[in-house]
Amino acid sequence: APTGLNLEAWRFLVLTDPARKLGMAELYRKSFEQMAELRADYARQTGTQPPALRKVHRDLADRLHEMPALILVCMQGRPDNTLARQVGFYGSILPAAWSLMVALRTRGLGSTWTSLHLIHERETAQLLGVPDDVTQTVLLPVGYMRDAVLAPAPRKAAREVTYWNEWGAARPD
């Protein structure tokens, strides 16, 4: 995956220990409940979260500890509040997380991208021994894709989310 200055400061913490996964799941569920009202407001405002998707989110919160593995994607260091540093920092780690998801898929493993655990980042760090100078970014629950029917996810048409030459402008004919 691309990384700023080719530093490869990413780190991947793979959780397979049942007790650690259970602790992580408890923090995740706590975050899930705290975010319930915000999620509902966002869904109402944007119309982007159908009921079936809400069920998927609840199922993940309820069953996170049952996943064969949880991968906590981290980056060494902590970005300060300057935009330039944050752009380079997250621009270095997020492609690595996505590349890992693609690699998992080629091996018959499914994963999903979530950052909900970050509401309780300190507690997560204490549970897993993550040093203070390491930034947690994404949690990837990983599971086997038995009998999975892979199909494109429902998405808006590209013309609805893509603009040409200025915000809101349709593609020139």
Where are these regions (language model features)?
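Glycine-rich phosphate/pyrophosphate-binding beta-alpha loops
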Residues: 3-5
